[in-house]
């Protein structure tokens, strides 16, 4: 039986982290933890409560009373915030931008950090976000950093929102992706950056299946290294 690994997937918005994390977890029969969705939940709750993104004290209290769970229902992964299915509500452009500002607050990150580590410390998990391999689990056995051009990521996001019936503009969507990049990379606490030992995959000219195949290859190689019994079987 293969050792249960901690797999970290980092990268900017619109690069395919959520889809790939979900499919990789399904293939490996691991638990999928979307850390970005956790910050989106904080942003949604703050928006509903009328809290400012820089009101750190109120945000800290908000996080302390918040329950976030990931469940599978009818074959689909759902995000529950205090028991409510907010899977769609947290994916709007407004909440996406707000989540970047909210996640820049140290107390919010500290609260979410503890929860993320608690969820993943036993292994057998795929975590995706922006600082998994650098901050949340710097000792993760497998680390990926996914990249793509801002224009390609903006186009993907535009098509995703259009498919949901939203009235969006391509140029504006690309601009929002670039703004999110600047916010994520420029924040003081846990900025977006590639871990030194992460495997970089540029997805600009790759489809999901191609990226997934590459990730599965890396995981299989790492399982061979991490499982001492494999060495004995090979000798």
UniProtKB/Swiss-Prot annotation:
NCBIfam families reported for this sequence: cmk (TIGR00017)
Protein name, UniProt field: Cytidylate kinase
Any one Gene Ontology cellular component term annotated for this protein: cytosol
Disulfide bond positions: none
Keywords for the protein's UniProt record, in alphabetical order: ATP-binding, Cytoplasm, Kinase, Nucleotide-binding, Transferase
InterPro entries reported for this sequence: Cytidylate_kin, Cytidylate_kinase_dom, P-loop_NTPase
Binding-site positions, ATP: 11-19
Keyword NAD: no
GO annotation (BP), single: nucleobase-containing small molecule interconversion
First-tier enzyme category under EC: transferase
Family: Belongs to the cytidylate kinase family. Type 1 subfamily.
GO molecular function, one term: CMP kinase activity
Record-listed E.C. numbers: 2.7.4.25
Reactions catalysed: CMP + ATP = CDP + ADP; dCMP + ATP = dCDP + ADP
